[in-house]
UniProtKB/Swiss-Prot annotation:
This is RNA helicase NPH-II. It catalyses: ATP + H2O = ADP + phosphate + H(+). A motif (DEXH box) lies at residues 296-299. The gene is OPG084. Keywords: ATP-binding, Helicase, Hydrolase, Nucleotide-binding, Transcription, Virion. It comes from Monkeypox virus.
């Protein structure tokens, strides 16, 4: 039976929902329907108040051990109370008295149907729920939320659309149905910042029970929010931690999981019902230890994120609920309808808090003339920034396709504009320091960025977006620039309009936009390895299926040729990055080498032992020809001589001209083969 969420269990958004304690007099004046709403309190009360509790006698009154201290005693036999004392909150019998809560504690036994609860039980659940602070009302104060989840400070005031009573009820119905849920909403409605918090709340109250119709045993598991990048894990976990009234992780319901996590970001007292913010790769290592799985930024089609969707769909009986969150379904709606079993689609209507104006700057050059198109684009960008300039003390973001273009455009703009220029992308280590400069500067700041800033960092003083409309899509041993998809455009545009009115200036024709099938330009070994680990049937169990299946089967044959057992592969997947699949051959040789190779993958520190080991794999590349690019760079046109992509052409930059062969150490390190 589908349960609607009674308003007394809404999450306190501190706008029109507040934490509240109900009195017995209020209960007496309620309708039967309103009283029956308190029956659902039995689930959080059993989990968080009555678990391991017992009956005590305190000053001659039977109470629950969570109410008062006293000697453990055998419970009395319960009939209908002779008298109700609302002042003392006790039921009076001829020979004894018992607290409302203790009466309910004794009556709420396994397999009892909650619709059988009478007024006597409901009064006790009201008292127990008040003690847990699980109830809410449309009146109250922010300060009343202190202590709800053990927090020392009040919850934040959140006026966003995702925490309105209507949205809360809709999300709860989808969550409790155990159907896969696809949740969309405009940028600024609070998808990532609020919906995970709401699901944490539902999990705290009702998670772990197989049904909300009757009392059963429960299996408490946390929620996980799986994200494609460490920056997002840190950003969103910190946002939700603060909004729940915590200043430190320890003892809060918030935990983080990602590779090489620093000690200070480990919650040493996590909550069983809590929420874990994790990178996709670490989410997969313990996927079924979570009750509710939230996968964010679905539109990005991060490889491991798509694999999580496939695994969760294949083994949907092992999880309670799956939420896929994305700003837009422009590219994926039809596939999701087919792929997911009976999915629920939820859209949270709403827009950014402030208006966003759009400006189109036409490029008269056809994109097929790449160099001329970019030169015209840079000239247009200077003109646009001069015409549509952020106010003093504010910033604008220029979206370009690659790290190399960040430097190219910054150099071009610095010579022509009097503003502060910065670069931010995924490989920049001092982003916080850069942002401090941006926020403290009285001048105009222009930030040049890759698609990294579409979601990974929120710039609070940004008022203008200048979008070149392109993205670099990596491919095995190369990659190419492509025009963005509709969902990427929505993400970029949504960077403004959150704090102040914004302007979105775009420099590309909308007809150039197209969906990007990332799987067609990826190494496919992870799909093979995780399919083996989770018993996926290829290719039909994949969320996105490669256009060229021959590459998938060649990858499978290549992996099989390593002669590594499935059990060993599973251990490697759980413990190492394996940025190049060939590294697996080295990880299985010795623990000492594995430790050094792992350190190289994490830090880039290349020891002689690791270099010699990788060279022994003979990952050769043949140099076909080269040409001079600039003072210290030569472009080498090469051919791959190993692996699935044997025969594929690649372009490699090196500081001097080379002939003959190179050995590949990593995707960025190459060693010339000594011809002597």
């Amino acid at each position: 039976m589908e349960k609607n969420l009674p308003d007394i269990f809404f999450f306190p958004n501190c706008v029109n929902v507040f934490s509240y304690k109900y009195s017995q007099d209020e209960f007496s004046n309620m309708s039967k329907t309103e009283r029956d709403n308190f029956s659902l309190a039995v689930f959080p009360v059993i989990k968080h108040r009555w678990h391991n509790a017992h009956v005590v006698k305190h000053k001659g009154i039977y109470k629950v051990s969570t109410e008062a201290r006293g000697k453990k005693v055998s419970p009395p036999s319960l009939g209908k109370p002779a008298h109700i004392n609302l002042m003392s909150k006790q039921y009076i019998y001829s020979e004894y008295a018992i607290s409302f809560e203790c009466y309910s504690f004794l009556k709420c036994i396994t397999n009892t149907e909650i619709n059988s609860f009478d007024e006597y039980i409901l009064r006790g659940l009201l008292e127990a729920g008040n003690s847990l602070q699980i109830f809410s009302n449309s009146v109250g104060k922010r300060i009343d939320t202190i202590g709800v989840l053990g927090n020392k400070y009040p919850f934040s005031k959140i006026p966003l659309a995702s925490l309105t009573p209507k949205a809360q009820r809709e999300i709860f119905l989808a969550w409790i149905s155990h159907r896969p849920v696809v949740l969309t909403g405009g940028t600024g409605v609070g998808k990532t910042s609020q919906v995970p918090k709401l699901l944490l709340w539902f999990n705290y109250l009702f998670g772990g029970f197989s049904s909300l119709d009757k009392i059963t045993d429960f299996h408490e598991r946390p929620v996980i929010l799986s994200l494609p990048r460490i920056a997002l894990v840190r950003l969103h976990s910190n946002t939700i931690l603060k909004s729940l009234g915590f200043k430190v992780l320890d003892g809060s319901p918030i935990s983080l999981r990602y590779g090489s996590i620093p000690e200070e970001l480990i919650n040493k007292q996590p909550k069983k019902y809590g929420i874990v913010f994790s990178t996709h790769k670490l989410s997969l290592t313990k996927l079924f230890s979570y009750g509710t799985i939230i996968i964010d930024e679905v539109h990005e089609h991060d490889q491991i994120g798509d694999i999580i969707i496939a695994v969760a769909r294949k083994h949907h009986t092992k999880i309670d609920s799956m939420f896929l969150m994305t700003a837009t379904l422009e590219d994926d709606r039809e596939r999701l309808k087919i792929f997911l079993p009976n999915p629920a689609f939820i859209h949270i209507p709403g827009d950014t808090l402030f208006k966003i104006s759009e400006v189109f700057i036409h490029n008269k050059i056809n994109p097929s003339s790449r160099m001329a198109y970019i030169e015209e684009e840079k000239r247009n960008l200077v003109t646009a920034i001069q015409m549509y300039t952020p106010p003093d003390g504010s910033s604008g973001i220029v979206f370009v396709a690659s790290v190399a273009q960040c430097h190219e455009y910054k150099s071009y703009l610095e010579k022509r504009l009097p503003y502060d220029m910065y670069i931010i992308h995924g490989k920049v280590l001092d982003i916080d320091e850069i942002l401090e400069k941006v926020y403290s500067s009285p001048n105009v700041s222009i930030i040049i960025s890759t698609p990294y800033l579409e979601s990974s960092v929120t710039i609070r003083n940004v008022t203008h977006i200048y979008d070149m409309g392109r993205v670099f899509v990596p491919a095995p041993f190369g990659g190419s620039q492509q025009f963005i998809s509709k969902s990427m455009r929505d993400q970029r545009k949504g960077r403004v309009g959150r704090v102040n009115p914004g302007t979105y200036v775009y420099f590309y024709d909308l007809s150039y936009m197209k969906s990007i099938q990332r799987i067609d330009s990826e190494f496919l070994h992870n799909y093979i390895l995780y399919a083996n680990k989770f018993n996926l049937t290829l290719p039909e169990d994949l969320f996105i299926i490669p256009t060229n299946l021959d590459i998938l089967w060649r990858t499978k044959e290549y992996i099989d040729s390593f002669d590594i057992s499935t059990e060993t592969w599973n251990k490697l997947l759980s413990n190492y990055y394996m940025k190049m699949i060939e590294y697996a051959k080295l990880y299985v040789l010795s623990p000492i080498l594995a430790e050094e190779l792992d350190n190289f993958e994490r830090t880039g520190e290349l020891t002689s032992i690791v270099q010699e080991a990788i060279l022994s794999l003979n990952l050769q590349i043949k140099i076909l020809k080269f040409k001079h690019k600039d003072d210290d760079t030569y472009i080498h046109f090469c051919r791959i001589l190993f692996g699935v992509y044997n025969g594929t052409n690649a372009t490699i930059y090196y500081h001097r001209p080379l002939t003959g062969y190179m050995n590949m150490i990593s995707d960025t390190i190459f060693v010339p083969v000594d011809n002597n």
